[in-house]
Every structure is written in C-alpha cells, then in structure tokens.
C-alpha cells in the first residue's frame, strides 16, 4: 500500500510486498511499499525513508513531499553532510553560507554540521530527494556549500 500511488490494502496476504531489504547490501522498495514516516521537525510534509543505518546503509535518504507552509528548520546535523535535490516544485533553502530558492533540478550540498532549513515556496507541492551521511574528511580538502541547478549544467558525454 502506498500514499504516493493511491494503492491501498495488501495484494493477497497481510503484509505482502515485493520490496526487498538485504541488510548491509541493498534495499529495493516498490511503489506499493512506500509509506509515510513520522519524523520530528517536518511540518506539513510527507516523508518516506528510502534507506537508513537501521537497514544497514551508511547514510539516510528520503523522499519528501512538502505541502504549502511546510518544511524543516534543520535538516542535517552535527558531523553530517547533507544534500537536497528538487524533483518538482519550489522550495527555499538556507544554511550558514547560502540562501536560495530552488526549482525543479535545483540542489544544495551542505558540509558537515551546517544544517539546511527547508521551506515550501510557490504553489503546489514540492517533491524532494534528501540525503545525509556522516562526513569523512579527505586530507588537504575541505567541503563547502554548493547551490546549483542540473538544468544549467552543459551536457557532456559520460563514457567518453
């Protein structure tokens, strides 16, 4: 059953699903297996956990629908780097370094400890992909905030 595709109830048996979670390896969640999760800090949002450390991942990622007046004042956390990508709709984002309005294809990367405030903008719902993980430093490099839109990136051949 899923709130995203309107499929409710179970296929044939109670708790029957085609989703597969192999702890520490992978998770494949079919559309009928997507459920809403109650996560503190999200107001007027539908949040689905796609992957998390409790599933064996080294990160957490989410599919978020932000409704009017919705958002989260603090996505990320101490020691966590975070990333938000706008699948559709419009949001405003703000961290210690940048404030921007993101539309479809827009994204923000925020370095460890620099949380992102997310707020609905425009009309209609906004759909986001959100990702966070424990930051692993690389000697000689430091992370910085990046705000851009994939639609502004020139196409280039990937495999040569």
What are the residue ranges of the model-derived segments?
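Short histidine-centered beta-strand/loop micro-motifs
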Residues: 72-78, 119-120
């Amino acid at each position: 059953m899923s709130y995203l595709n309107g499929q409710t109830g179970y296929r044939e048996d109670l708790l029957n699903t085609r989703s597969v979670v192999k702890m520490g390896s992978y998770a494949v969640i079919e559309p009928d297996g997507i459920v809403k999760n109650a996560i503190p800090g999200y107001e007027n949002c539908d949040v689905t956990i796609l992957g998390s450390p409790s599933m064996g991942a080294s990160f957490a990622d989410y599919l978020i629908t932000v409704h009017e007046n919705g958002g989260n004042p603090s996505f990320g956390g101490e020691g966590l780097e975070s990333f938000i990508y706008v699948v559709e709709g419009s949001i405003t984002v703000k961290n210690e370094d940048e404030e921007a309005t993101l539309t479809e294809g827009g994204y923000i990367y925020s370095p460890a400890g620099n949380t992102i405030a997310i707020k609905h903008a425009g009309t209609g719902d906004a759909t986001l992909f959100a990702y966070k993980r424990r930051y692993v430093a690389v000697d000689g490099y430091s992370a910085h905030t990046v705000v851009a839109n994939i639609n502004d990136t020139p196409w280039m051949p990937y495999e040569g």
